[in-house]
From Swiss-Prot:
Molecular-function annotations in GO: clathrin light chain binding
Keyword Acetylation: no
Lumenal-facing ranges: 93-171
Membrane association type: Single-pass type II membrane protein
Protein name as it appears in the record: Neuronal vesicle trafficking-associated protein 2
GO biological process assignments: clathrin coat assembly; regulation of postsynaptic membrane neurotransmitter receptor levels
Length: 171
């Protein structure tokens, strides 16, 4: 601890007493120039370009990669190839998934077609294949136009057989 009310400039003060447990320490000491700067070295070594020339000669040559870097590159590329194969397999399976058709329909040529049409045209001659596709396309167009004309809440018979309003005589 530092004893308060002591002046470090007083040289003739009484010596510090150990009895009271305080030490008289000057809070500010004068600075000496020798302690501010380090002594300059006697010998300075300056590295020149000639020391680095052996490294520059090897700089232009092909550097063989380290084995650890090479194996990591191979492992990363194999992992990416494996993931790409899995993605392609999932996409392929999603597009070629065996679709289920309602009862009375058969899945053929990526479409659900009525089983009666399939049985009829499969018993025909081989040239009937083009007619088969024509019937399918007409069937799907007719199905779409019927679905647009009739709402799902109305029956087909109610739309066709609507009662006509009675004609009034006069105008």
């Amino acid at each position: 601890m530092v004893k308060l009310n002591s002046n470090p400039g007083e040289k003739g003060a009484k010596p510090p007493s150990v009895e009271d447990g305080f030490q008289t320490v000057p809070l500010i000491t004068p600075l000496e120039v020798n302690h501010l700067q380090l002594a300059a070295p006697e010998k300075v070594i300056v590295k020149t370009r000639t020391e680095y020339q052996p490294e520059q000669r090897n700089k232009g040559k092909f550097r063989v990669p380290k084995i650890a870097e090479f194996t990591v590159t191979i492992l990363v590329s194999l992992a990416l190839a494996f993931l790409a194969c899995i993605v392609f397999l999932v996409v392929y399976k999603a597009f070629t998934y065996d679709h289920s058709c309602p009862e009375g329909f058969v899945y053929k040529h990526k479409r659900c077609i009525p089983a009666s049409l399939d049985a009829y045209y499969s018993s025909q001659d081989p040239s009937s294949r083009s007619r088969f596709y024509t019937v399918i396309s007409h069937y799907s167009v007719a199905k779409q136009s019927t679905a647009r004309a009739i709402g799902p809440w109305l029956s087909a018979a109610a739309v066709i057989h609507e009662p006509k309003p009675p004609k009034t005589q006069g105008h």
